[in-house]
Amino acid sequence: MILAAALAICAASCSEWTDPDPKFHDPVNINSEAYYQALREYKKTDHAICFGWFSGWTGTGSDLYNQLRGIPDSMDVVSIWGGKTGLSKEQKADMKEVQTKKGTKVLWCQHVVDLGRDITPAGHTALEYWGWNGSSYDGSDEADEAIRKYARAIVDTVKHYGYDGCDFDYEPNFGYRGNISGSPAAMHVFLSEIANHMGPTSGSDLILAVDGEPQTLLAETGPLLDYYIIQAYYCPGDYNLDQRFSGLLAKFGVLEDEETIMRKTVWCEDFEKYQTSGGCDFVTRDGIHTWSLMGMAMYYRPSLPGCRTGGVGAYRFNLGRSKSDYYHLRAAIQQMNPASK
């Protein structure tokens, strides 16, 4: 079954988010333009998103596993995991279809490690092309200008291919430490330049998100981001999510209130491992036993009654298509944004 626009439209405030009165009614014919118009309008509303990293993208073939058009209609944001450049005409058409027909946002995903990663032209060294390539960030004017130049090149590339923003994979303490990622100050230089063109302070509709270890960034970097995407893989319960959230609150709480941080936080599970089950065994703070993606969709803060999270997501979520036709993602969407009756 296709889950999509038959979802309750979420209002702006957290208290209104729990209003049981349906604010949206599903058009009778889900193949009609009225259906897709309603779907696009739903995705513009204030609601918890469904996010995921999409792998093996070809945009063509008999297997919709490789095509964005085969994902659940109500998925809000997709981050391309690998193969994000040199797009074929089939990939371009596939991306444009889900963007224009379904209102799905498609993001450029990239590890942030060293200056020039994925962008330095062939035949050039980072030093000669960008103007700096120290082993670690030194705070010099040369370093800052090189990092900003690199950031602008990424922005230009993202816009060239028609992506809806960036998802930067930032994991300096998990094997991806470089002359940018190894320094929160360098990351701030990098992301503040990106934020001139995308994210909540840019005035654009392009998304700027950081996944992995956003809590390692400087506090002043937080307001530049739309989402804190947390790889809460193999999460056994709310107590674990509480610990992770406490790290975000400790870092960004000096500039953002708890509600803002909550509404930006997207919990993610690993579907490379849990594509058939939706996650590991999970226990909520209310004693409910479920699978972890569903537990993440049910997450709430006692200190913020009625306030939604940013949403949930999954790594390599499209592996679940052949196993269950995205059952676990669809169920999580329904939990966060119940369909009108």
Which residues are covered by each model-predicted region?
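Secreted glycan hydrolases and related glycan-binding modules that recognize and/or cleave
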Residues: 14-341
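C-terminal motif of bacterial Sec signal peptides marking the signal peptidase cleavage site
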Residues: 9-13
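Sec-dependent signal peptide recognition
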Residues: 1-4
